[in-house]
Structure formats: C-alpha cells, structure tokens
C-alpha cells in the first residue's frame, strides 16, 4: 500500500503512532482453522493477547460485539467462530490482569438503555483505573431486533438520532458526580456530600429517563468514546461526541480526505482538531523480504476464503442452497432465487435483483474466459482485507508518513492469526517505529485518555 504525500501537506515531525487491536472474535479475517490457534472464546486467549499488547505498549485492546449470531440457510453460520462472550464482561476480567492497556467495548445504542449501559461502562472505567472506552454502534436490522422486546422498532434513518440522544444522556450521567462528591473519613456524617450527585432527567423523543448515576468518575473522568460509522450521520455523531474514530479509510488519499472532512465538522461543533483521534482499521502482513510478505499475503487471502466459504459466498447471491456444488467445479448453471437466504431481508427488491443478475452474468463471463472454478473465482472477486504488506522497515516508513502528514493518528489492527501475527508486530514492527522516534518506549500515563494524548472531557 503505497502513494506519495500531497504537495503542501501538513507535516508534524514529532507525531506519534497510536495503536489498537480490534479483536472481533468472529468474521472471515480470523484464520481460526490454523492448527496453532488457541480457543477464540477462552479467557486464557484474551489474557494472553492483552498482556502481549501491553508488552508492545499499545493504546487499547478493542473488542467487537454482536447481538445476533450470523446465519446461512436458516442455520448458524459455523464457518467462522460463531459466538463470543459479552465484551464488558471480558474486559472486566482483563482489567484485573493488566495494568495499562486500554479496554474498549463495542456497545449498541439501538437496543441498550442509557442508564444501564452508562453504569456498566463507568464500572469498568472505575475498576480499571480509567482505562475503559466505548465503541458506539447502531443497528437497523430488524432480525437482530427480534432478539429484543423492541424488535424492528426504529427506522433506519433514525438510528443516529437515537444514538446522539443516547450518548448525550450517558455523558450527562457520567458528569453528574462532582469530583469531590465522596466525603472524606473522619467527621463525615454521610458517605457522599449532600447535593454532590445530581439527578438526570431527559425526554428527548427517543431517549427518556429519570436516573441517578451510582458510580463515581474514574481517573480519566469518563470512558473514552469511539465511533465507527462512515455515513454522514456517523461522521456527524463522531464530530459532536467521539474522542476516537475507527474508520475504514486506509488508502492514503482517502484517509487524507476523510480526516479533512472530520476536522471541518469538528470546527462546526466548536471542537479543536486535536480533540479527536483517527484510527483506521487495517491488517498487517510482515515478511523478512518484500517477496516473502507478498507470498504470505496471498496465503492469508486463500486461507480466509476456504472452499466451504466460497460456496456460502455464492449462496448469498443465488439465494438458494448450493451445498451440492463442488467448489472446485464450475459456477452453478441455475438462475438466482427471488428471495434472500437471510430471513430478515425477505424478497429481493427489483433493483437489488437486477444488480445481482448483472453481477452473476459478469462472473460467469469471467469464469468462462479464465477457466475458473467456484473457489478460484470467489478468491478473485472477493475484496482483500485492507493490509499493509512488507518488511517491518517498509511498513514502519508507511505508518510514519501517514501519521506525520496527519492523514491518520494511528491504526486499529485486525489480526488474521492470533497470537502469531500480533507477536510479529510487537517484536518486529514496534522496534522499527521506536527507532524512528514515532512510538513510545514506555507508558507515560495510566489512563486510556493519557495514552491517546486526549484532553480532559469538557463536561468535567
């Protein structure tokens, strides 16, 4: 992944690379079939990874969260790791066995409730000594909602409206304790000073509550807020409330444009450019030589698309069971169905069906021209994970350029093998960054906010 910096781009020779790891626990990126891979739902695995990242002086360990198990043909999609423990519960366990690494939980604003989630996150923040973060996400999928009392209750276009109201309620709850609310021992007659804890009452349309926060502020004031949406609504939510953005814009030119857009939005909300960190998601594939790195990247791509996954991929486009087809044989000759395999989607709209028919026709033409099997075609047409591929020195040079020209502030790494791909980064890439003066050689703070060099929350 290479490109030149634009002429006249800002340059900060002292900018530091911030690093997190986004451990989804599920999804095609993770090669769980690796014979050396540990159990991906075992607490021992998460403890090992968290301690490894702390040894590598990472800012944060970032856990994904899902409120619905993925399905295919009406059954659990078991070609990936199919389940995962609750993120806050996992991170609470990790808080007890780590000292510095930030602990970021993905939590949904569509199907949670502000007072309850604010309390759970504040508890993690307090018990970890100010190391908690919240990755704010929304859900518009009615099938996910079917797991909840309010299944399908919120139209797609209003999810960010509720998210904004939800975050504002959580921030008000976190700010409702005065810094010295807890009375000192000695002559105090009550545990908390009278009037030092304010009630919070809100009715903003999509969020209604009357509550009192039960957890005092942590050493960092409140959890660090992450936001991952790339739509206009997501960017606006980030500009108003986020401390960190987890973006999908890894290509340099797109990263520059994305950063410029976000910083312009920050100004519109009276925020400084330094009040937000941008950490795009990326994979890292290292080799001792460029050729070795490229060969490994090809191996990773092939492992991520196994023969059963290739069949499952086509089933999403044909809308029917294709398990009888040989992944090493030709594409199915049958026409696609008018229904989706995902029961939440029902019948395919005519525009979507027309697009699928055109795409399938294109695939058939390509497969015939190049004599490709199902597996070969799917590997060819599936977009590769956004990756930095090269020697540790090459990747370090790229990252320094990205960060010091303010395209990004660092990266949130999605590992393809656990723990080996992360061990390579800690043991080979981190020292290269340190040699360039672009990465810490020790933690200088104790909280996640300090690791990210973020200002204190305005509300405190």
Where does each model-flagged region fall?
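Active-site mouth loops of central-metabolism enzymes
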Residues: 29-44, 106-115, 151-153, 157, ...
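Substrate-recognition/cap regions that form aromatic- and gly/pro-loop-enriched pockets
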Residues: 351-431
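Short, conserved secondary-structure transition motifs
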Residues: 278-292, 449-460
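Hydrophobic faces of well-ordered beta-strands that scaffold small-molecule active sites
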Residues: 17-21, 61-63, 101-107, 130-136, ...
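Conserved, mostly hydrophobic/aromatic
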Residues: 19, 53, 57, 94, ...
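N-terminal beta1-alpha1-beta2 module of alpha/beta enzyme domains
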Residues: 2-97, 220-223, 446, 458-460
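Internal, glycine-rich beta/alpha segment that forms the wall or movable "lid"
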Residues: 6, 11-17, 113-236, 240-241, ...
């Amino acid at each position: 992944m290479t490109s030149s910096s634009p002429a006249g781009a800002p340059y900060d020779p002292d900018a530091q690379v911030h690093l997190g790891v986004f451990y989804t626990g599920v999804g095609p990126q993770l090669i769980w079939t690796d014979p050396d891979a540990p159990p991906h739902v075992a607490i021992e695995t998460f403890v090992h990874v968290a301690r490894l990242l702390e040894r590598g002086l990472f800012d944060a360990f970032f856990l994904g969260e899902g409120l619905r198990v993925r399905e295919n043909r009406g059954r659990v999609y078991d070609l990936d790791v199919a389940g995962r423990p609750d993120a806050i519960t996992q991170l609470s366990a990790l808080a007890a066995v780590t000292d510095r690494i930030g602990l970021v939980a993905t939590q949904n604003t569509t199907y949670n409730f502000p007072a309850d989630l604010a309390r759970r996150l504040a508890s993690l923040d307090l018990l970890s000594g100010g190391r908690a973060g919240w990755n704010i996400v929304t859900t518009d999928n009615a099938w996910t909602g079917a797991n909840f009392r309010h299944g399908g209750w919120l139209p797609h276009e209003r999810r960010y409206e509720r998210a904004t109201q939800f975050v504002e309620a959580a921030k008000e709850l976190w700010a409702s304790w005065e810094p010295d609310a807890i009375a000192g021992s000695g002559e105090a007659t009550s545990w908390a000073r009278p009037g030092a804890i304010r009630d919070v009452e809100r009715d903003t349309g999509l969020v209604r509550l009357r509550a009192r926060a039960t957890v005092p502020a942590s050493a960092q004031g409140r959890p660090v807020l992450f936001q991952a949406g790339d739509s206009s609504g997501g960017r606006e939510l980030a500009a108003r409330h986020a401390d960190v953005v987890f973006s999908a814009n890894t290509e340099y030119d797109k990263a520059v444009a994305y950063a410029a857009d976000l910083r312009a939005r920050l100004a519109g909300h009276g925020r400084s450019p330094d009040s937000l960190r941008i950490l795009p998601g990326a994979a890292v594939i290292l080799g001792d030589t460029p050729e070795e790195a490229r060969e490994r990247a090809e191996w990773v791509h092939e492992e991520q698309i196994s023969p059963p996954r290739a069949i499952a991929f086509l089933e999403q486009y044909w809308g029917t069971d294709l398990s009888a087809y040989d992944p090493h044989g030709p594409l199915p000759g049958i026409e696609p169905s008018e229904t989706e395999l995902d029961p939440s989607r029902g019948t395919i709209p005519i525009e979507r069906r027309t697009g699928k028919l055109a795409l399938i026709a294109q695939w058939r033409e390509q497969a015939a021209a190049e004599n490709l099997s199902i597996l070969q075609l799917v590997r060819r047409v599936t977009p590769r994970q956004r990756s930095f591929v090269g020697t540790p020195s090459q990747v370090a040079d790229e990252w320094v350029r990205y960060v010091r020209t303010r395209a990004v502030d660092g990266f949130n790494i999605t590992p393809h093998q656990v723990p080996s791909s992360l061990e390579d980064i800690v043991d080979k890439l981190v020292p290269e960054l340190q040699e360039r003066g672009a990465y810490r050689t020790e933690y200088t703070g104790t909280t996640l906010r300090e690791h990210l060099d973020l200002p204190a929350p305005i509300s405190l």
